């Protein structure tokens, strides 16, 4: 699943852990309350711990600190950091570009939908629970 601009904005708005009414969110995003509800269902599929309360709105179970791409780039000035909210696999992203990468180049994401662990087992990484990082480094033989 890709993270559309509307869904990214919803996550940003909800990251404070406070209640936000569907009407308020819809007004801020220029969409209907029904559309807000559909986007919330999609965000739950990413593993976000969202809940709703009649008369109060939607909220995350706990506040969430989202990464700041500019700050990450500043902390790693030697090599580019490719940042994503959602990606299939950080490792696969680098693997597909291996001939164009420089040493230390990395890929960072808040959620992977097709991550792989040891022996090809699925790597579960719901949104907002961790930062996933893969780094390219060429080792001389």
Positions of the model-derived regions?
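N-terminal lobe of the biotin/lipoate ligase/transferase fold
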Residues: 2-141
């Amino acid at each position: 699943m890709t993270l559309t601009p509307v869904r990214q904005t919803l996550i940003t708005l909800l990251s404070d852990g406070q209640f936000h009414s569907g009407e308020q969110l819809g007004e801020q995003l220029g969409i209907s309350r029904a559309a807000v509800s559909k986007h919330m269902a999609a965000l739950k599929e990413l593993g976000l711990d969202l809940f709703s309360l009649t008369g109060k709105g939607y909220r995350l179970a706990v506040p969430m600190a989202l990464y700041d791409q500019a700050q990450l780039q500043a902390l790693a000035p030697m090599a580019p950091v490719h940042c994503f909210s959602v990606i299939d696999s950080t490792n696969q992203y680098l693997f597909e570009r291996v001939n164009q990468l420089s040493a230390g180049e990395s890929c960072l994401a808040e959620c992977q939908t097709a991550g792989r662990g040891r022996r090809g087992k699925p790597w579960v990484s719901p949104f907002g629970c961790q930062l996933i990082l893969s780094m390219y480094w060429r080792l001389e033989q």
